[in-house]
Amino acid sequence: MGDVEKGKKIFVQKCAQCHTVEKGGKHKTGPNLNGIFGRKTGQAPGFTYTDANKNKGIIWGEDTLMEYLENPKKYIPGTKMIFAGIKKKGERADLIAYLKKATNE
């Protein structure tokens, strides 16, 4: 498991421009991520996803996020997420640790 505080810094630097995490947070360019763990791809209420995201059919969890965040366009070809990914596994683990905490509050 990664470091929550380091993960928060990564989120602020690389994710917060397009995503929110708090319960009831607004969608931006990307969906609000609250409740993402255990949710199917393309299912945040009120956000318009590509068919690729809706049809991927996986459940978000540590393993699926670890793979997705390395290279989003490879994991879900056709996603509208323009972020290139995080190559360092340790940084992805930190971000996932933060998301696990922040999206479940």
Curated annotation (Swiss-Prot):
Family assignment from sequence similarity: Belongs to the cytochrome c family.
Descriptive protein name: Cytochrome c
Entry keyword annotation includes Cytoplasm: no
PTM notes: Binds 1 heme c group covalently per subunit. Phosphorylation at Tyr-49 and Tyr-98 both reduce by half the turnover in the reaction with cytochrome c oxidase, down-regulating mitochondrial respiration.
Function (record text): Electron carrier protein. The oxidized form of the cytochrome c heme group can accept an electron from the heme group of the cytochrome c1 subunit of cytochrome reductase. Cytochrome c then transfers this electron to the cytochrome oxidase complex, the final protein carrier in the mitochondrial electron-transport chain.
PANTHER family named among the record's database cross-references: CYTOCHROME C (PTHR11961)
Residues modified to N6-succinyllysine: 56, 73
Chief location of this protein within or outside the cell: mitochondrion
Alphabetic keyword roster: Acetylation, Apoptosis, Electron transport, Heme, Iron, Metal-binding, Mitochondrion, Phosphoprotein, Respiratory chain, Transport
Modified residues (Phosphotyrosine): 49, 98
